Amino acid sequence: MTWMIRDVPKDSRPRERLLASGPESLSDHELLAILLRTGTKDESVVQLAQRVLQHFEGLRLLKDATVEEMTSIKGIGPTKAVQILAALELGRRIHQSGYNDRYVIRCPEDGAKYVMEDMRFLSQEHFVAIYLNTKNQVIHRKTVFIGSLNASIVHPREVFKEAIKRSAASVICVHNHPSGDPTPSREDIDVTKRLAECGRIIGIELLDHLIIGDQKFISLKEKGYV
């Protein structure tokens, strides 16, 4: 027999609890159980959901899991894996949709908020350029490169070529520290100074360089490097 949500005692069923008390009342594994719908012959869907989260050490790693990684778990086939991935992607798109309508960056906090959820859990360093118009509205965002930050790799040409193409008035550069600690390195500072100087020469201001950690960030402009 395959365990389904209806086989769970009624007062413990995630769907019924969501209807009665709202989604915020459910735990992570209960929400996941609703997506999975069925368990296995040996465990309920709630138990399966708990095991999936334990496998990925919670939502943080589940967020970036692949179909192959999910289907390696007993009880998770391609259909369940696709359901989970679709829900995760919808969540990402909903989060981003709030910022796509000409998001305005007035201060470092605005810039960090714009990218924090996308960048704080990345396992590699991503260097991103955010292009703004004269009203400080975001007109484009581009990942310039992925990998350890190095002055020989981050060429200003790659950053400002897109700025010219988009007729941007200014640029904010952002990169993440996978360690979660946004403290700038010597390379971070050198890259920032080089980009700021090139921006002054061509007339497209580097407004800031933000380093993203885990729910925290550092503005190199506030530190005096821009």
From Swiss-Prot:
Name of the featured protein: UPF0758 protein GTNG_2548
Highest taxon, organism lineage: Bacteria
GO molecular function: metal ion binding; metallopeptidase activity
Keyword Isomerase belongs to the record: no
UniProt motif (JAMM motif) ranges: 175-188
Keywords: Hydrolase, Metal-binding, Metalloprotease, Protease, Zinc
Binding site for Zn(2+): H175, H177, D188
Similarity field: Belongs to the UPF0758 family.
InterPro entries: MPN, RadC_JAB, RuvA_2-like, UPF0758, UPF0758_CS, UPF0758_N
Keyword Ubl conjugation belongs to the record: no
Signal peptide range in chain numbering: none
Domain MPN span(s) in chain numbering: 104-226
Gene Ontology biological-process annotations: proteolysis
Coiled-coil positions: none
NCBIfam families: PRK00024.1, radc
